[in-house]
Amino acid sequence: MDDKKNKMDALVAAVVVFLCSFAVGHAEGEEEAGVVGSRIVGGFEVVRNSLPYQASLQQNGVHYCGGTLINAKWVLTAAHCEITNVHIIVVLGEHSLGNVEGKEQTFVVERAIRHAGYDSTTVDNDIMLLKLPRAAVLNAAVQPMQLPRAGARLEDETSCLASGWGTVGNGVMPDALRAVYLDTTSRSYCNDAYSGTLTDNMFCAIYAAGGRDACQGDSGGPLICNGALNGIISWGYGCAYPNYPGVYTKVSNYITWIENTIANNM
């Protein structure tokens, strides 16, 4: 019992340390590698503009989190991607971070609305809406992703696609958008890995052999399962460890919150 409690305390502490380092590092425009949760390792570069829902969140021209366009004026991301007192820039139609390719649409976020129940210790309710100052121009490179049904449940071993510009290994950030296929895991398997710290608003996905995962800089980005935005990249222990799945915000639990928030902030 003491060993299990110590493991759980260590995991919670690691998440707290990560979130603090995330806020400090990105307030200074820095990137940190090898920490918990900022959660692509072992993936592949996608065909240019083949994931038209993908958003890049940037500060001072530096990518730091992902997001997903869910309609022409709103992007969904993780609550821990909020940076206070700093303008968040959203870039849609992005592929190469280092090159202007003519498809990009850039916005200074008009309003960031973090879920009121977000807990930085447990990382519960890790979800945030970003309102754009004008509607995005929808075209082949920029399209919203549909949301799942409220309360929808994914079967174990459902194949999903995570994407982003996060670390590919040894702290190296890629220039081009990458993606990785992962399978959802049973709740019991994931809860055992994280000593019972999962809440009902979280689910997990993993590549069983290890070596593939979302990682530093992918946070807030999409996990697409069954053609819908079922998950938001949230946290995990390291990146691509065989016995530690990535943890994702369960979007189907927030459909009413998303709809009401948008309706109340037109």
Residue ranges and their predicted role:
Residues 47-87:
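Catalytic histidine site
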Residues 46-50, 69, 82-84, 120-123, ...:
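Extracellular/periplasmic catalytic domains that process cell-envelope and extracellular macromolecules
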Residues 1-19:
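Classical eukaryotic N-terminal signal peptides for Sec-dependent ER targeting/secretion
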Residues 33-34, 38-39, 57, 75-78, ...:
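Conserved H-D interstitial segment of serine endopeptidase catalytic domains
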Residues 101, 116-119, 135-174:
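Active-site substrate-binding loop(s) of clan PA
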